[in-house]
A protein has these predicted regions:
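Bacterial N-terminal signal peptides that target proteins for export
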Residues: 1-9
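N-proximal helix/coil linker or "cap" segments that precede and/or mark the start of modular domains
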Residues: 6, 13-36
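Short loop/turn microsegments at loop-to-beta-strand junctions
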Residues: 30, 55, 139-141
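A short beta-strand-turn-helix
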Residues: 33-55
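Short active-site neighborhood of thiol/selenol oxidoreductases, capturing the structured segment around
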Residues: 47-70
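Structural microenvironment flanking redox-active thiols in thiol-disulfide oxidoreductases
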Residues: 70-109, 121-123
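Structural micro-motif
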Residues: 111-113, 131-143
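Thiol-/selenol-based redox modules, centered on thioredoxin-like
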Residues: 137-179
């Protein structure tokens, strides 16, 4: 019984432990291509192509249509006009299949920005945006990537509340310094 209790405590501690964005500011952002959806229409997203237009806000979220992820997508959708004025592209990434993201991009992203499917966790793992080594879902991690392909901001927090605000501040700071 004591062993079972200890195992349960360890499991709870591991699940409660925060994930950390381990790609640091200044690191080279891993390039990727992924199937994405915007306004319910699928397309192939390329980070390299997006960076030619300006900075990219890349945010990872655990799962479409869950409470926190829905509210986070709503927040990014509301801020898209401001991100666009700064020349920034926003893309969300999760493990969800593309058909689920077709619906999510229409309803929760309000057809304002794309979301990409990373069903094999290749992108999440390359950005150290997973909860643990055997995790299927992404940690809630946001990056701002400069047009040169460098990480200029990284933030991990399971609470969705500040991801939009903090990435907006980072984009504003980057744009101001680039002038």
């Amino acid at each position: 019984m004591k062993r079972l209790f200890m195992s349960a405590c360890v499991t709870v501690a591991l699940l409660a432990a925060p994930a950390y964005a381990t790609l640091t500011v200044g690191a080279k952002a891993p390039d990727f291509k992924a199937r994405a959806s915007m306004a319910g229409k699928q397309f192939d997203f390329s980070l390299a192509d997006a960076l030619k237009k300006g900075p990219v806000v890349l945010y990872f979220y655990p799962a479409a249509f869950t409470p926190g992820c829905t509210l986070e997508a709503n927040n990014f959708a509301e801020a898209m006009d401001d991100f666009s004025k700064l020349g920034a592209t926003v893309i969300g990434v999760s493990h969800d299949n593309i058909e689920t993201l077709d619906r999510f991009s229409l309803t929760e992203c309000r057809s304002k920005f794309p979301v990409a499917s990373d069903a094999d966790q290749r992108i999440m793992k390359s950005y150290d945006a997973v909860v643990g080594p055997n995790a299927v879902r992404a940690s809630r991690t946001s990056y701002v990537i400069s047009p040169a392909g460098q990480i200029v901001y990284a933030y991990t927090n399971g609470d969705y509340t500040h991801h939009t605000e903090y990435t907006m501040d980072a984009v504003k700071k980057f744009v101001a310094q680039a002038k």
